[in-house]
Amino acid sequence: MLRCIAVDDELLGLDLLEDYIRQVPYLELAAKCKNALEAIDVLRNHPIDLLFLDIQMPGLTGLQFIQSLTRKPMIIIDYGL
């Protein structure tokens, strides 16, 4: 089972990702985050294998977030909704 988080500043994007992740039997949604700072908090407390990430977010962008990671999970970037 791969533990993953979804990071998107738009609620629709988070909801679509949640629906997709729940359909894949080997994925477990550990958290939905509205921004990169929330995702950083989740990563501090939980081991995450897979990250679904929006690139264009206010504040810390998706690319800046990736650069800040010390342990790199598998990353899936911007799904272009």
Mark where each language-model region is.
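Active-site beta3 strand of CheY-like receiver
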Residues: C4, H46-F52
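Hydrophobic/aromatic residues located in beta-strands of well-ordered beta-sheets
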Residues: C4, L29-A30, M74-I75
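Active-site residues of response regulator receiver
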Residues: D8, D54
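Two-component/phosphorelay signaling modules centered on CheY-like receiver
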Residues: L11-A31
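Helix N-cap/capping motif at the beta->alpha junctions
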Residues: K32-D41, G62
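Receiver (REC) domain active-site loop signature in two-component systems and cognate sites
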Residues: M57
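A short, hydrophobic beta-strand element within the central beta-sheet of small alpha/beta folds
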Residues: Q67, K72-L81
